[in-house]
Amino acid sequence: MSVCTLSVPVSSISPGRRCSTFGDAGILGCVSINSNTDEDDVVEGKMVAEGANKETKLPAKKKRKKGLRIKGKRRRKKLILAKKFSKDLGSGRPVADAPASLASGAPEQDEESLFEGNIEKQIYLPSTRAKTSIVWHFFHVDPQYTWRAICNLCEKSVSRGKPGSHLGTSTLQRHLQARHSPHWTRANKFGVTNGEEDFTLDLSLSPPSPGSNGSFEYIPTDSVDENRMGKKRDKSASDALRAKRGRFLIKSNIVKHALIPGTRAKTSAVWNFFYTDPQHISRAVCNICKRSVSRGRPGSHLGTSTLQRHLQATHPIHWAVANKDSGAIGNGLDETETESSDLLNDTMPGEKSSGSQDLTAEDLSDSDTDEPPCLEVENRSESPIPVADQDNPVHAQERETTTHCENAAANQISQAVIQMIVEDLHPYNYFSTPAFQRFLQIVAPDYRLPSETYFFTKAVPQLYDSVREKIFLTLENVQSQKIHLTADIWTHDPSTDYFIVTVHWVSLETASSPSNGGTPNFRKWAVLCVTGLAKDCLITNILQELNDQIGLWLSPNFLTPSFIVSDNSSNVVHAIKGGGFTHVPCFLHCLNIVIQDFFCEHKSIENMLVAARKTCHHFSHSVKARQILQEFQNDHQLPWKNLKQDETGHWISTFYMLKWLLEHCYSVHHSLGRASGVVLTSLQWTLMTYVCDILKPFEEATQRVSVKTTGLNQVLPLIHHLLFSLQRLREDFQVRGITQALNLVDSLSLKLESDALLSAMLKSKHCILATLLDPCFKNSLEDFFPQGADLETYKQILAEEVCNYMESSPGACQISSSETSGPLVRLGTDSFTSIKEGTSSAGSLDSSAAGSVAVGSKSSLLPAAVAVVDEYFKEKYSELSGGDDPLVYWQRKVSIWPALTQVAIQYLSCPMCSWQSECMFTTNSHFHPKQIMNMDFDNIEQLIFLKMNLENVNYDYSTLILSWDPENKAVQSNEKEILP
C-alpha cells in the first residue's frame, strides 16, 4: 500500500460537522489518497494521539479503544477501520476526495490557529513500519535475506535479528559506532533525516486554546499549497532541525531528554556530569575533571557503571549532592535500550555533546499558552536533572578546592609509588603487603592503591613509552651526523644475558651548567635497548639486534654510528666487526684483564687473596664476630667503616677489600685470634700492603675514567700516567731495597706495555686524533705518542678529516676558507708547512704524504684544512687545566673553525668505556639477581631501561597524571619534554 503525509490540527468542532465515525469514536483514521480500494478493503492504521472529545463514550465492546497513551516504550497500536468509515466518506466517490470533503465541511478560520501548538507528532500509515532511525541512512535491507541489512559504507551484511522475530536496529547502530564512528558522529550532530518523510504523517497536536475550534482537518502534503503553508514555515525557520524531531514535555514540567531513535536512552543521572567523547564514541568526558572514562569496548555494550564509579571515587561530594537533590540514588545503573523520538540538538564548541545536553522548556515548545501539554507519558523512568552546584557558590568553590587538593595528593602518592618501583626496583607485590597497607592507611587514609597488575601492565609500560619518545625526539635534534654506541652483555640470570646498547653524542647548545658553578656537561647519552638474549646466542643474533636498534633509533634521524665501544666478549666483538663497524675496546675491561692476569701470575698473591676473602666472609656472616670487632674499635677509638665485599671478576672490588683490611688490620688481627681456621700471616699482611700501593694508580685511573667528561682523548695520557707511576714506585722500592715489591712492579709494568688490546689502542688512529684534538695535551704530544709514531703524519691525517667534512658541508667550507685565507701566506718552513705549500702550488699532495687524498674538489679544499690545523697547533693554550672538558674550548671555536670543531666533537665525544652499565650491574647498585628471576622477563627489561635513563633524562614525575578510575587508566600529559 502506498503512503502519504497529512498534517492534522486538533479542533473542538461538533461531531455533526464531521463524519460520524470521528464524532462517535473520537479516533483518527486515514486512507492513502493513492489507493483505489473499494469498501471491502480493510485498512490498518497506527495511532499516537487522543481523540479531541474525551467525554464521548464508546460502545461497551469498543470502550477499550478510547484514547491511546504512551506507556514505557513507544508502542504503535494497529486499529482496523470498519467498512462504515469508507461509506461515511461517500460511496462511489474517489477516495482522493475524502480529505477535500472534510475540509469543505469545516468553518473558515484563521490558519495559524490550526498550528498554534506547533508541536509535531508522527502517525504511520497502514502496513508500513516507519524507518525512523537514522541508521537507515547508512543501511539498506538485504534483498536476499530480509532479516539482514547491508552497510552502504563497507558493504557488510549485518543481522537485525532472528528470522520471524522482532527485527531491530541495535546491531546496526553498534556496527556504525565500531566501524564508522566519524560518519555516525557527524550524522548525530547534524540530525540527518532526509529520505524518511515518505513514511510519516505530520500530526500537529496542541492543547485547546480559546481561539481554536477543535476540528480535525486533513491536508495531503503531496498537493499542499506552498502559499498556504508559508506562514508556518517562516515561523519555524530558525528551528528547522528541531521541528523535524518529535518534542514533548512531561506533565510535571521537568524537561525530559529527547532521544534519538534506535539509540540508548540516557536516563541515568551520571549524564549530568558526563558527555560523550566526540572522538571516541565508547568514552565519556567528565565535566568536572575533564578526564576521559571508558564506557566499554567499541562495538560492545556501552554502560554507565564505570562513569558512576568514577563519580563515587573522584567526585563523591558532587555525586552525593546530586543524588540527594534529585532523589535518584542508585540511578547510575546501565540504561535500558529504548526507541524514542528522533531528536538531536547541535552543540557549539565547548558545550556538551547532544547525548548529554539537557533541553529547556523554551527549546521544546513554541506555544504561547501556559497550559500544560495534553500528551501524557506514563510508566517511563523519568530522570530528573540533578544539579551539583545549585547551593551557595562559596560552598561549591570550597568543595572544588577540597577535591582538587585530594586529587593532587593522590597523584603525588601514585607518582611516588611508581618512582620507588622504577628507581629502587621494588617488586610489585611489595606494595600489597599488609605492613605497607597499614602504613598507607595512616599516611593517606583516603588513598586507594591500585593492584600490582595495574603497575605491571599499564603504569610502567606507559612510562616506558614516554621516556622512549623523549629520547627519540632528542635524537632528532642532534647536530652531528655521527654518534657513538656502547654495546655490553651482562649476566645476572642462569639462562639469560642482557644486551645493552647506549648512544653517546655532544650538544654544545643545550649544555646544562651544574649548580655549583663547575664545568657544563656537553656530553649526552641514553640507553636505547635492554634486550634479553639466550646464553647460547650466536653472533648473528647479536648483529641482528644491533642493526635493529640502529634502524629504529638512528636511521630515521639520519645518524650513523662512528665507533662502537664494547668489552672483550668474543661474540660482541665479532658481531661489531662483522657488521662493518669500527670497534673500540673498553678501557676499564683492558685494565681488568691486565690486573687479573697479574694476580694469577703470582702464587703468593693468590694465597693472600684467599685468606683475605675468608676473613671478610667470617665478619660478614657472623654477627658475634662483627660485634667483637666493633667493640674493639670503640675501645681503642679507631674509626669504623663498612665492610667491603669482593666481587668475582672485578679487580676494583678486590682492591677495596684489601684496603678495608689494612685500615682495620689491628682490630682484625686481635679479633681473628678467637676464631679458628681464619688466619692472616704477617707475610700476607705485608704483601697486602705492597699490592695496594701498586694498584693505587690504577684505582685513580679508574675513577678518572668514570667521570662523565672523559673520552678517547684520555687513553694515551692515562696509559702514560700508569707507566710513569709504576716507574716511580719501582724507584722507591729500589731505594728501600724491597725485592719482592720490585718484582711485582716489573711484572705489572711488562703486562701493561705488552697487552695486546692496550697496545692496539695506543697505536689506533682514533685515539691518537682524539689526543691531538685535546688542547690540554697538544703541547706535550711527544710524551704520549708510542714509539715509532710520527706527529706530522697524524697532523696530515687530521687535515684530511677536516677536508672530508668541508667537502660534505659546503657551508663550513666557505667559512673556513674565508677566515683562513691569511694564514696560508704566513706559513712557516716546518715539515707540515711544506705539505701545505706543495698542495697550494701543485694542487695535490705527494703520494707518500697523503696517499688517500682525493683529487678534484677535495684537493682544492685541502690547503684550507691544512691551514686550519696548523693554526690550531700554533695557538697558545693556557686557559684550561688538564682536568677540564676540552669541549669547553671547542664551544668557543665553533664560529672560528667550524669544520675542525665538528671533527673534534666526533672524536672527543666517544667514551672510553661503558661506565653506565658498569655502575648498573655491580654489587653497589640496587639490582639484585633474585629479584629478576621473580619478575616478568619483558617487564624487567623495561624497568632496567627506565632505571638507567630516568636520571639522565631528568624526567619530571609530576607530568605523569595518574587517575585510578575503575579501569585503572593512566593518562600521560601531552607536553613534550626535551632532554636538557
Swiss-Prot record:
<dbReference type="InterPro" id="IPR012337">
    <property type="entry name" value="RNaseH-like_sf"/>
</dbReference>
<dbReference type="GO" id="GO:0005634">
    <property type="term" value="C:nucleus"/>
</dbReference>
<keyword id="KW-0863">Zinc-finger</keyword>
<comment type="function">
    <text>Transcriptional repressor which binds to the consensus sequence 5'-GCTCGC-3', transcription regulation may be tissue-specific. Regulates the expression of target genes such as: IGF2, PGAP6/TMEM8, ENHO, and PIANP. Acts as a transcriptional repressor of growth factor IGF2, thereby negatively regulating postnatal growth of muscles and internal organs, especially in females. Negatively regulates myoblast differentiation and myoblast mitochondrial activity via its regulation of IGF2 transcription.</text>
</comment>
<feature type="region of interest" description="Disordered">
    <location>
        <begin position="328"/>
        <end position="397"/>
    </location>
</feature>
<feature type="binding site">
    <location>
        <position position="175"/>
    </location>
    <ligand>
        <name>Zn(2+) 1</name>
    </ligand>
</feature>
<feature type="modified residue" description="Phosphoserine">
    <location>
        <position position="383"/>
    </location>
</feature>
<dbReference type="GO" id="GO:0045892">
    <property type="term" value="P:negative regulation of DNA-templated transcription"/>
</dbReference>
<keyword id="KW-0678">Repressor</keyword>
<keyword id="KW-0479">Metal-binding</keyword>
<dbReference type="GO" id="GO:0005737">
    <property type="term" value="C:cytoplasm"/>
</dbReference>
<keyword id="KW-0804">Transcription</keyword>
<dbReference type="GO" id="GO:0000122">
    <property type="term" value="P:negative regulation of transcription by RNA polymerase II"/>
</dbReference>
<dbReference type="GO" id="GO:0005730">
    <property type="term" value="C:nucleolus"/>
</dbReference>
<feature type="region of interest" description="Required for nucleolar localization">
    <location>
        <begin position="1"/>
        <end position="89"/>
    </location>
</feature>
<dbReference type="InterPro" id="IPR008906">
    <property type="entry name" value="HATC_C_dom"/>
</dbReference>
<dbReference type="GO" id="GO:0008270">
    <property type="term" value="F:zinc ion binding"/>
</dbReference>
<dbReference type="Pfam" id="PF05699">
    <property type="entry name" value="Dimer_Tnp_hAT"/>
</dbReference>
<feature type="binding site">
    <location>
        <position position="289"/>
    </location>
    <ligand>
        <name>Zn(2+) 2</name>
    </ligand>
</feature>
<dbReference type="GO" id="GO:0005654">
    <property type="term" value="C:nucleoplasm"/>
</dbReference>
<feature type="binding site">
    <location>
        <position position="154"/>
    </location>
    <ligand>
        <name>Zn(2+) 1</name>
    </ligand>
</feature>
<feature type="binding site">
    <location>
        <position position="310"/>
    </location>
    <ligand>
        <name>Zn(2+) 2</name>
    </ligand>
</feature>
<feature type="binding site">
    <location>
        <position position="151"/>
    </location>
    <ligand>
        <name>Zn(2+) 1</name>
    </ligand>
</feature>
<dbReference type="GO" id="GO:0034451">
    <property type="term" value="C:centriolar satellite"/>
</dbReference>
<keyword id="KW-0597">Phosphoprotein</keyword>
<dbReference type="Pfam" id="PF02892">
    <property type="entry name" value="zf-BED"/>
</dbReference>
<keyword id="KW-0677">Repeat</keyword>
<dbReference type="GO" id="GO:0061178">
    <property type="term" value="P:regulation of insulin secretion involved in cellular response to glucose stimulus"/>
</dbReference>
<dbReference type="GO" id="GO:0001835">
    <property type="term" value="P:blastocyst hatching"/>
</dbReference>
<feature type="binding site">
    <location>
        <position position="315"/>
    </location>
    <ligand>
        <name>Zn(2+) 2</name>
    </ligand>
</feature>
<feature type="zinc finger region" description="BED-type 2">
    <location>
        <begin position="265"/>
        <end position="322"/>
    </location>
</feature>
<keyword id="KW-0539">Nucleus</keyword>
<dbReference type="GO" id="GO:0000976">
    <property type="term" value="F:transcription cis-regulatory region binding"/>
</dbReference>
<feature type="region of interest" description="Disordered">
    <location>
        <begin position="89"/>
        <end position="109"/>
    </location>
</feature>
<dbReference type="InterPro" id="IPR052865">
    <property type="entry name" value="Zinc_finger_BED"/>
</dbReference>
<dbReference type="GO" id="GO:0001227">
    <property type="term" value="F:DNA-binding transcription repressor activity, RNA polymerase II-specific"/>
</dbReference>
<feature type="region of interest" description="HATC (Hobo-Ac-Tam3) domain">
    <location>
        <begin position="868"/>
        <end position="950"/>
    </location>
</feature>
<keyword id="KW-0805">Transcription regulation</keyword>
<keyword id="KW-0963">Cytoplasm</keyword>
<keyword id="KW-0238">DNA-binding</keyword>
<feature type="compositionally biased region" description="Acidic residues">
    <location>
        <begin position="360"/>
        <end position="373"/>
    </location>
</feature>
<feature type="region of interest" description="Disordered">
    <location>
        <begin position="201"/>
        <end position="239"/>
    </location>
</feature>
